Curated annotation (Swiss-Prot):
Protein name: Alanine racemase
Family (UniProt): Belongs to the alanine racemase family.
Cofactor(s) the protein requires to work: pyridoxal 5'-phosphate
Species for this entry: Verminephrobacter eiseniae (strain EF01-2)
Residues reported in the UniProt entry to bind substrate: 130, 304
Pathway: Amino-acid biosynthesis; D-alanine biosynthesis; D-alanine from L-alanine: step 1/1
Length: 371
């Protein structure tokens, strides 16, 4: 028998989250962002649930090829653009759209020979200072692209750095409006946080929104708001079972480094999940977990293959957890109880994004219970 740990992907949650995005931006087109293999969920697994989007956005040419192989004939956007000249030939062959964020990419386009002109998204560095042309250079980059026979359409985009926080988007939105004033072309500004928090403003919604983490049921502005506030459903459940129970006395310690000391008689459960499965090492005592649908906590240090949980809340509820009891590390328990991946990530000093993407290869993944 394999270890009892398993990640389950829920197609109904993916579909519901996409509908939630459309409710926020009924007049905009939606990019379903599936970079990092759909945030660890698997592009092939999420494809049918998200094919109601208007396009897919990702980074990797191999993943783009995979989407075409699945039968997708709509738009695919390469969010970091091309990395070398030969990538443009594949863009032509597969009909890919791609971001242009630097002079080197324009140079590659200028030297490219193809019968199929390219659709590009010209990126503005509105203040995040990762990728994109500075505002004072944006219009000249647009003019260079517009003069190329290799380019048939130029869309305009930027990425907000603080759509999820109190600084907001106003300065970067203003920079985008100034840089793109009177330029033709579709606009794309909103990431997940901006889509939920700022899309009431038509200038923010623009023509395309880029829905990423929101599709997978994580709140982009946690802890300011949780997933429930936004009406999102967890698309991934990581679950395992208890493989042992220990009875402790006052003063007994748990795990490596004796990080937890029992305050009195208590029972702990040993769950088959550890940091080698992608569960964060730094999720120590107090990290929330569900056992048979009841909320409790991790105690002690997470090991490579195991972690330990406090069974006191279950016993207080009149339950007798034991070998084989269900343990929900994040997501939805069989009882329907939900533990947000964002809460677990916060306890480990990280983000839900990282936990999704860090799921270990050794963890079996099913879609709606099917391998």
């Amino acid at each position: 028998m394999p270890r009892p740990i398993q990640a389950r992907i829920h197609s109904s949650a993916l579909q519901a989250n996409l509908r939630r995005v459309r409710q926020s931006v009924p007049d905009a087109k939606v990019w379903a962002v599936v970079k990092a293999n759909a945030y660890g969920h698997g592009i092939a697994r999420v494809f049918e649930s998200l094919r109601g989007a208007d396009g897919f956005a990702l980074l990797d040419l191999a993943e783009a090829q995979g989407l075409r192989g699945l039968g997708w004939r709509g738009p695919i956007l390469l969010l970091e653009g091309v990395f070398e000249p030969r990538d443009l030939e594949l863009c032509s062959r597969l009909g890919l759209w791609h971001v242009v964020h630097c002079d080197e990419q324009i140079d590659m386009l200028a030297a490219h020979r193809s019968q199929a002109p390219q659709h590009v998204f010209l990126k503005l560095n509105a203040g995040m200072n990762r990728l994109g042309f500075a505002p004072q250079r944006y219009r000249s980059a647009w003019a260079r692209l517009g003069a190329l026979a290799q380019v048939d359409e130029i869309s305009l985009m930027a990425h907000f750095s603080d759509a999820d926080g109190p600084r907001g988007i106003a300065p970067q939105l203003a920079a985008f409006v100034r840089a793109t004033q009177d330029l033709p072309g579709a606009r794309s500004l909103c990431n997940s946080a901006a889509t939920l928090r700022h899309a009431a403003d038509a200038s923010v919604r623009a023509d395309w929104v880029r829905a990423g983490i929101v599709l997978y049921g994580s709140a982009p502005d946690f802890p300011g708001h949780d997933a429930g506030h936004w009406g999102l459903q967890p698309a991934m459940t990581l679950a395992t079972r208890l493989i042992g129970v220990q009875q402790l006395q006052a003063g007994d310690t748990v795990g490596y480094g004796a990080r937890f000391v029992a305050p009195g008689p208590m029972a702990i459960g040993v769950a088959a999940c550890g940091y080698a499965d992608g569960y964060p090492l730094h999720c120590g005592t107090g990290t929330p977990v569900l056992v048979d649908g009841i909320r409790t906590r991790v105690v002690g240090r997470v090991s490579m293959d195991m972690l330990t949980v406090d069974l006191t809340p279950l016993q207080r509820a009149g339950l007798q957890p034991g070998f084989g009891s269900e343990v929900t590390l994040w997501g939805r328990a069989s009882s329907g109880a939900v533990l947000s991946i964002d809460e677990v990530a916060q306890a480990g000093g990280t983000l839900g994004y990282e936990l999704m993407c860090a799921l270990a290869q050794r963890v079996p993944v099913t879609l709606d219970g099917r391998a």
